[in-house]
């Protein structure tokens, strides 16, 4: 049995429990949380779809949450949700950040979003007209695009299984309040699919930022901000370089990680 790891991830001395044999978060989750914080400014109710062990809710709450902010993380992996709940306890955030086990595909197809979860944060958001903010770092690879060559947990985190891209966006639109904001991280190769799905779900892309490994290279990550029922105008932010060309994190990434 794999020994569970307790990582000190920074951001106000946050701790995160992770199983090394399962999928562990990467830089894309961190930059998504920072991207959301820089645009949303704050929130009353937020949800993270496909939350894994909960790193995005913890970081975004640190960067943009307030005393009355509440976050709900949803994932279909019971083991990951168990670790996320324990991390919430370790960080003294049990009241502010809740986690629940459920399938995004079922949420996308359910008749009543309010009835999907009995959790207090979920019910509070639904009674408030929906979530103010939804974040998601969904699987990047479409169904049938690759042969499983890794552990089941890692494969499910990277490849669409039950819920596809449409399912994640339908679920987000279902639980957002009118003019609520979605923040998504994905691969540029899926950008056309993302925009088509967003428009079908009334999620209007408003802000986009490409992420490159180093300055001058092609982007391998894209950050997208959408507004439910928003007007048609798309703003491009300057590219974000992860590395500085010498193998170290760029100055902006170090600022995002709050190391400088």
Which residue ranges define each predicted feature?
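Short, structurally constrained coil/turn elements
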Residues: 10, 65, 93, 199-202, ...
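Conserved Class I SAM-dependent methyltransferase catalytic core
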Residues: 21, 162-219
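General small-molecule cofactor/ligand-binding pocket signal
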Residues: 17, 98-100, 206-209
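Conserved SAM/SAH cofactor-binding pocket of Class I
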Residues: 34-147
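SAM-dependent Rossmann-like transferase core, predominantly class I methyltransferases
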Residues: 4-45, 49-63, 225, 241
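Residue-level signal for inorganic ion chemistry
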Residues: 32, 137, 168, 226
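Mobile active-site "lid"/loop adjacent to the S-adenosyl-L-methionine
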Residues: 138-167
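SAM/dcSAM-binding transferase cores
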Residues: 217-260
